[in-house]
UniProtKB/Swiss-Prot annotation:
Ligand binding (Zn(2+) 1): C147, C150, C200, C203
Zinc finger (CR-type): 134-212
BP terms from Gene Ontology: chaperone cofactor-dependent protein refolding; DNA replication; protein refolding; response to heat
Source species: Yersinia pestis
A Pfam entry, by short name: DnaJ_C
Domain J: 5-70
Record flagged with keyword Metal-binding: yes
Keyword terms: Chaperone, Cytoplasm, DNA replication, Metal-binding, Repeat, Stress response, Zinc, Zinc-finger
Cofactor section: Zn(2+)
Protein's name in the database: Chaperone protein DnaJ
Underlying gene: dnaJ
InterPro entries, per database record: DnaJ (IPR012724), DnaJ_C (IPR002939), DnaJ_domain (IPR001623), DnaJ_domain_CS (IPR018253), HSP40/DnaJ_pept-bd (IPR008971), HSP_DnaJ_Cys-rich_dom (IPR001305), HSP_DnaJ_Cys-rich_dom_sf (IPR036410), J_dom_sf (IPR036869)
Function, in words: Participates actively in the response to hyperosmotic and heat shock by preventing the aggregation of stress-denatured proteins and by disaggregating proteins, also in an autonomous, DnaK-independent fashion. Unfolded proteins bind initially to DnaJ; upon interaction with the DnaJ-bound protein, DnaK hydrolyzes its bound ATP, resulting in the formation of a stable complex. GrpE releases ADP from DnaK; ATP binding to DnaK triggers the release of the substrate protein, thus completing the reaction cycle.
Subunit structure: Homodimer.
Length: 379
C-alpha cells in the first residue's frame, strides 16, 4: 500500500513552520496513542504514521530531501544509495510526550528549550548559461542575527539571566482543574526557567537584532528551476543562543531567446530556406559552447529533428551530458524580386502532371484523399 503524504498525515501545509508541525503531532498523539485509544483498531498504525511524519518534517535535512524526492528519498538505495533512514529511531520525542502526557498526568518537569532560528528563503534568478555552467553570486538578505553586545544572552554585559521566581527554574507551573493537576508553561518566563532582569540596551533582552548580511552562494553546474540549495546555519539566529535556522536558495532559470530546456536536453528551432531544404547543404547552429556546423540532407521537411549529442546540459548530480536537438523550420521566402518570382513560376509549372506528383508525394496523397472524401459524399 502506498504511503500517505507526510504533510497530509499531520494535516499541515507544505510551508508549515516547525511549531505548527509539533502542534499537529501533539494532537494526533493524544488521539491515537495506544494507551489512550481502545476503540479504534487502527489507532496504533495511525500513531506510528504520525510519528514517522513528525520525525521527517522536524529534521531540516530530512524535510528538504522529502520535499525534493518524496518517499523515495528514504527507500533502500534512494538518494544515491545512502539517503536518510525513514520512520525509524533516532528522533528525540521526549519533548512531545513530556508536553502531551506530562500536561495531563503531571509529569514532564523540564524547561522549554530556546527556539531554533527560523529558516529563510531567497529566490535567485539565473540565466540559462549560469545555470548550465555554475556560478558564484553574492546575495544580501535581511535577517535576525545574534546581538554582538550580549552575544545572544539578552542580558546586559556584566549581568546574567536569573532563575524565574515563579517556577523556580522548572519552566512549568501546576494548576489544579477538578480532580487533575495540570502542568503548563510558566507565564512569567514563558517556559524558559530564567528571566532577564537587566536587559541588553541594544537588543532589549531578545538576544537578536535585525540586520542585513551578504553571503557568497556557489551555484553548482546543471541546476534547474525548482532546485533548492541549503546553506546550513545561515537563517535567523536562534533565541538566546539556540541554533540558527537554515537559508534555502530557490532557483529560477530565466527564459532564453534561443534555447528551451527539458531536463538535461536543450531544444532550438533552426530556420532554413526552401532551396536548402530541397537540395541540402550545411549551416552553422548555436550551442552553449559556440557555433558548430550542421549538415542538412536533401529533401528535408519542416519538423525534422537533428540531435547533437553531448551539447546539452551536464546533470547536476554528475554523469552523462544531455543533447541539443535542433528542429528544422523551412521558411517561406518573402520580399521576392520579379526575377525570383518568375523562377518560382517556372518551377511551379514543372510540378504539373506526373512529374509533379513525384516531386510532391504528400500533396498528391492529400489531394487523392480529398477527392475520395467528396466522391463518398455524392454516392
Amino acid at each position: 500500500m502506498a504511503k500517505r503524504d507526510y504533510y497530509e498525515v499531520l494535516g499541515v501545509s507544505r510551508d508549515a513552520e516547525e511549531r505548527e508541525i509539533k502542534k499537529a503531532y501533539k494532537r494526533l498523539a493524544m488521539k491515537f496513542h495506544p494507551d489512550r485509544q481502545s476503540e479504534d483498531k487502527n489507532a496504533e498504525e495511525k500513531f506510528k504514521e504520525a510519528k514517522e511524519a513528525y520525525e521527517i518534517l522536524t529534521d531540516a535535512q530530512k524535510r528538504a530531501a522529502y520535499d525534493q524526492y518524496g518517499h523515495a528519498a528514504f527507500e533502500q538505495g534512494g538518494m544515491g544509495g545512502g539517503g536518510f533512514g525513514g520512520g525509524g529511531g533516532g528522533a528525540d520525542f521526549s519533548d512531545i510526550f513530556g508536553d502531551v502526557f506530562g500536561d495531563i498526568f503531571g509529569g514532564g518537569r523540564r524547561q522549554q528549550r530556546a527556539s531554533r532560528g527560523s529558516d529563510l528563503r531567497y529566490n535567485m534568478d539565473l540565466t540559462l548559461e549560469e545555470a548550465v555552467r555554475g556560478v558564484t553570486k553574492e546575495i544580501r538578505i535581511p535577517t535576525l542575527d545574534e546581538c554582538d553586545v550580549c552575544h545572544g544572552s539578552g542580558a546586559k554585559p556584566g549581568s546574567s539571566p536569573v532563575t524565574c521566581p515563579t517556577c523556580h527554574g522548572a519552566g512549568q507551573v501546576q494548576m489544579r482543574q477538578g480532580f487533575f493537576t495540570v502542568q503548563q508553561a510558566c507565564p512569567h518566563c514563558h517556559g524558559r526557567g530564567q528571566i532577564i532582569k537587566d536587559p541588553c540596551n541594544k537588543c532589549h533582552g531578545h538576544g537578536r537584532v535585525e540586520k542585513s548580511k551578504t553571503l557568497s552562494v556557489k551555484i553548482p553546474a546543471g541546476v534547474d528551476t525548482g532546485d533548492r540549495i541549503r546553506l546550513s546555519g545561515e537563517g535567523e539566529a536562534g533565541e538566546h543562543g539556540a541554533p540558527s535556522g537554515d537559508l534555502y536558495v530557490q532557483v529560477q532559470v530565466k527564459a532564453h531567446p534561443i534555447f528551451e530546456r527539458e531536463g538535461n536536453n536543450l531544444y532550438c528551432e533552426v530556420p532554413i530556406n526552401f532551396a536548402m531544404a530541397a537540395l541540402g547543404g550545411e549551416i552553422e547552429v548555436p550551442t552553449l559552447d559556440g557555433r558548430v556546423k550542421l549538415k542538412i540532407p536533401a529533401e528535408t521537411q519542416t519538423g525534422k529533428m537533428f540531435r547533437m549529442r553531448g551539447k546539452g546540459v551536464k546533470s547536476v548530480r554528475g554523469g552523462s551530458q544531455g543533447d541539443l536537438l535542433c528542429r528544422v523550420v523551412v521558411e517561406t521566402p518573402v520580399s521576392l524580386s520579379e526575377k525570383q518570382k518568375q523562377l518560382l513560376r517556372e518551377l511551379e509549372e514543372s510540378f504539373v502532371g506526373a512529374a509533379g506528383e513525384k516531386n510532391s508525394p504528400r500533396a498528391k496523397s492529400f489531394l487523392d484523399g480529398v477527392k475520395k472524401f467528396f466522391d463518398d459524399l455524392t454516392r
